[in-house]
Amino acid sequence: MISHLLPTTSLTIHMPSIILYPIYFDKSRPRRFRCVPKDKAILNPLAKNIADVVRDLGYKCKLEPLKTHPADWVNPGRVEMVLPEKIQKKYVINEIAKVLLLRPTVKTDPLSLPIQNVPARLPENPPAYPKGVLGNTILPLHSPALSGGGISENMFQEMMQEMQKQPGLAGGMNPMAALAGMGGPAPPMPTPQASSSQRKQKSIEPEYDLDLE
């Protein structure tokens, strides 16, 4: 059943607020991405489900289905929640996590968030990830891993470049390390091709970049 969330265009939040991304509650992610312990996290969290829980707990919020955490590019969506006075962010997140544990994500949940110009039906194929990357198996219908046959190499490269600009990656962490936190090894970094003249020279340890060929 589709809940009546406040549309993103009709709610302007002037009070103190917090941003909630699905990755904060994702059991498959390393601790540096989660905001709750692993035993309080779930598999395949969705922003729409988080928004439903926030509303059911009595808080005001707006769902932003197109906003994406830099380390969770396949799972678009986030929730902006009004944080009442004298309520701490940690307390709210733990309360949300408790309810999410009682409402594990199911395959049909993405249908509860219709997206314009996206067919309201479950995908026939599983999410498509770049080689060597594992990820969530239940995603919003507008996930780039479900549309157009999956993530193209060009799109993947653009995402990597965008992640490098994001301050949300602790300590300037390499975005490849962020992808490694998706439950599988990061895609192998390409080795630059040496010219014939370079092959004759003494081998030198190559520098790696993010250009995926």
From Swiss-Prot:
InterPro entries in alphabetical order: Signal_recog_particle_SRP19, SRP19-like_sf
Annotated localization: Cytoplasm; Nucleus
Pfam family, one: SRP19
GO molecular function (one): 7S RNA binding
Region (Disordered), start-end ranges: 176-213
Major localization listed first in the record, in broad terms: cytoplasm
Keywords annotated in UniProt: Cytoplasm, Nucleus, Ribonucleoprotein, RNA-binding, Signal recognition particle
Annotated GO CC locations: cytosol; nucleus; signal recognition particle, endoplasmic reticulum targeting
GO biological process: intracellular protein transport; SRP-dependent cotranslational protein targeting to membrane, signal sequence recognition
Keyword Ribonucleoprotein applies: yes
Inactivation phenotype: Leads to sensitivity to camptothecin, thiabendazole, microtubule depolymerizing drugs and DNA damaging agents.
Subunit organization: Fungal signal recognition particle consists of a 7S RNA molecule (scR1) and at least six protein subunits: srp72, srp68, srp54, sec65, srp21 and srp14.
Function: Signal-recognition-particle assembly has a crucial role in targeting secretory proteins to the rough endoplasmic reticulum membrane. It must be involved intimately in the translocation of a wide variety of protein substrates.
Family under the similarity heading: Belongs to the SRP19 family.
Protein name per UniProt: Signal recognition particle sec65 subunit
Lineage: Eukaryota, Fungi, Dikarya, Ascomycota, Taphrinomycotina
